[in-house]
């Protein structure tokens, strides 16, 4: 009879690495899901159209299901098309945590944090490791990537100028950047490429964070005048005329140049490394500044 029911030793279930994807857009980003799996997540639990009011109960599902030593195997990734909503979701998640009932969390709505960080770290390295006192112009600097990049550069001591189509938007955003990151950020109008030369005059570093397929800075406006130029636009016509999409430290018109893919490849390294680190502890919060710390380690 015993031989008919052979003893089956108890096997401890594998503790899966679970990533809760809180996406403010109706359809959760497939891009973010794929990167999460490539970074080592075993399962991605995706929620779309997430609002502030949804966050607490979703977070409770993360923090009340595993014991203290296993809590690090659950993490949260906040994404979506709108960074301003993402920031609110991060705040709501942080408020739901208490004592050691928390899980590591990363904010990267629309890839804004990792893209901005990748650009800033590349710029810093190209300048010898220090941007303090450098005059840096961020064209289309009122968008999510531009504001994060400008903020990180200002925080590091750079003299930053952002451009905006509307002067009132530039003023409002520059004040918000200074409030969040500190430092000095000016704003100048730039409505069309014919105004670029005046808008970027006196700069040492040029970073374009403008919309896809819009050329903001003609070659004549920057050639021979800048030490570093970075264009985050990958769709022709590119944002800075004369910079190639694959540039990754190439020499262009006397400047060290980085194109969208030159920055994008490093952005992907940073993104994956950050996701991987979420599962090493249960109290990590990865926003612009802390993501930059990770990127600097990778750049060494």
Cite the ranges covered by each PLM segment.
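N-terminal ligand-binding/catalytic initiation module
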Residues: 1-100, 290-300
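Gly/Ser/Thr-rich loops at beta-strand to alpha-helix junctions
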Residues: 26, 81-85, 111-115, 141-146, ...
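Conserved active-site and cofactor/substrate-binding residues in soluble primary-metabolism enzymes
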Residues: 50-54, 84-88, 114, 118, ...
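Glycine/charged-rich beta-loop-alpha catalytic/anionic-binding loops adjacent to active sites
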Residues: 98-106, 132, 252-254
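A glycine-rich, Thr/Ser-enriched phosphate-binding loop motif common to dinucleotide/cofactor-binding enzymes
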Residues: 106-124
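Glycine-rich phosphate/diphosphate-binding loop of Rossmann-like nucleotide-binding domains
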Residues: 125-205
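Rossmann-like adenosine-cofactor binding region
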Residues: 185-257
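Adenosine-phosphate binding glycine-rich loop
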Residues: 235-300
